[in-house]
């Protein structure tokens, strides 16, 4: 029995952690953003460690309510910083969403093949996928006219995301065991149902591992690229603040 439960835990962990991976990948970086960012067509507003900065698309700067007189170099710094924020934050959000959906689709195919199209595990993974996307939207909140990045939400979202995965795991494990048991019972094959179920679990686990191997490099590259962009944005922020004095 202990051996069976360890195998089930391994299967469930593989399924769920693969799904959750890219929701967290973009935030696993030594550099932590220090500001909220509000992007609209009129300006990029940065609030937090930077005080309150508003940068226009042309590089004009309002700092803590005061319009600053800028040198050409300062204006170019501000222009480049707000341009990078407008480009990189949507890119991060889109990339994370795409990879989360890609993992869901890939896992769904594995579940259909191994457990059948009527498996309730499919519903559980779809629900988990939607919940993780909702968590991500707490960090990068999209609006019709732009987006808002909430830097203080990062740690809480990581915590809540892990809890969602853990809460879903029990149901996935139970459904997998029940459905494989029913499959074995209806097939009428073999005299050792437990051994047959364990064999099926092994096949499911291997299929998931193969899918993870296919996607792992892309997920890791995305995480590294996000960290690089976040690091560059933080350097630009510090350099601009130093220049403004």
Describe each PLM feature range.
Residues 2-11:
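Bacterial N-terminal signal peptides that target proteins for export
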């Amino acid at each position: 029995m202990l051996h069976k439960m360890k195998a089930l835990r391994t299967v469930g962990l593989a399924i769920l952690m693969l799904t959750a991976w890219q929701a967290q990948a973009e935030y696993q970086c030594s550099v932590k953003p220090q500001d909220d960012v509000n992007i609209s067509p009129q300006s990029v507003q940065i609030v937090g460690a930077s005080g309150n900065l508003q940068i226009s698309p042309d590089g004009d700067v309002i700092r803590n309510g005061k319009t600053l007189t800028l040198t050409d170099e300062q204006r170019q710094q501000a222009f480049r910083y707000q341009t990078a924020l407008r480009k990189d934050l949507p890119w991060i959000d889109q990339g994370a969403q795409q990879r989360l959906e890609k993992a869901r689709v890939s896992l769904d195919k594995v579940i259909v093949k191994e457990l059948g199209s009527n498996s309730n595990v499919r519903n559980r993974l779809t629900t988990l996928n939607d919940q993780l996307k909702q968590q991500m939207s707490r960090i990068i909140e999209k609006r019709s006219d732009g987006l808002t990045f909430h830097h203080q939400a990062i740690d809480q979202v990581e915590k809540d995301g892990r809890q969602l995965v853990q809460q879903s795991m029990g149901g996935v494990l139970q459904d997998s065991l029940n459905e494989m048991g029913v499959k074995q019972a209806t097939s009428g094959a073999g005299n050792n149902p437990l051994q047959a179920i364990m064999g099926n679990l092994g096949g499911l686990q291997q299929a998931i591992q193969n899918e993870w191997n296919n996607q792992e490099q892309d997920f890791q590259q995305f995480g590294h690229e996000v960290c690089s962009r976040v690091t560059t944005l933080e350097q630009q922020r510090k350099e601009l603040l130093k220049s403004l004095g």
